[in-house]
Amino acid sequence: MNHPRSIAMLAALWLVVSVTSTPVRRSPDLEARRRSAIDRSMIRFGRSTLPVVPPAQPSFLQRYSAPQPAALTADDLMTFLRAYEEDYSSPVSKKSASFVRFGRDPSFIRFGRSVDEENSGYQAETNTYPQRRHRARNHFIRLGRDNELSESNDEDRYEVESERTKRSVVDPCNDCA
């Protein structure tokens, strides 16, 4: 009587262990979406992984010569200060100050809205559209509805001046005296 009970317990234990040890399979599209989201965030916040480059083999002289103490010369200091001045001479907006302070690459700041007009927005993939500055227009273009938006803008631009006058300026009745 003890033997069948132990066999049943062993079978149940084997079943639990086999189910818990098998990894959960995600669908391939879900896995691809997760990976691309991780890649996007790594690129956006400046933590993109560098390509793995094997270390160069040191030459014979480097390998067997006496080690030189790493000293900072005056020329090194001047080049460092010039490079630092060039990097930080441009004004940094309040939004990007923390971005740079946290050690991220300043070239990634352009993802948000920019302060200066010449660099604002980004070019479309086809390079046929003008530079876009507004997110709503981006969504219209992605949906293929940019013609509707441009037609409504043309109508607004060429409005009749009489329609633009205030109601309070127009006399309610011309014959009243």
Swiss-Prot record:
Biased composition annotated in UniProt, kind: Acidic residues: 149-158
BP-aspect Gene Ontology terms: neuropeptide signaling pathway
Chain's gene name: RFa
Physiological role: Regulates ecdysteroidogenesis by direct innervation of the prothoracic gland by reducing cAMP production via the receptor for myosuppressin. The neurons that innervate the prothoracic gland during the fifth instar are most active during days 0-4, after which they reduce and then peak again on day 6. Expression suppresses the biosynthesis of steroid hormones called ecdysteroids that elicit molting and metamorphosis.
Main localisation: secreted
Cellular compartment(s): Secreted
Extent of Basic and acidic residues compositional bias: 159-169
Signal peptide start-end: 1-21
UniProt tissue specificity: Only expressed in the CNS and predominantly in the thoracic ganglia. Strongest expression is seen in two pairs of large neurons in each thoracic ganglion. These neurons are ventrolateral neurosecretory cells 1 and 2, they project their axons through transverse nerves into the periphery where axons from the prothoracic ganglion innervate the prothoracic gland.
Span list, region Disordered: 145-177
Protein name (record): FMRFamide-related peptides
Keyword set, alphabetical order: Amidation, Cleavage on pair of basic residues, Neuropeptide, Repeat, Secreted, Signal
Residues that make up the propeptide removed upon maturation: 22-32, 47-93, 113-131, 145-177
Modified residues (Phenylalanine amide): F45, F102, F111
One cellular component (GO) term of this entry: extracellular region
Family note: Belongs to the FARP (FMRFamide related peptide) family.
Modified residues (Leucine amide): L143
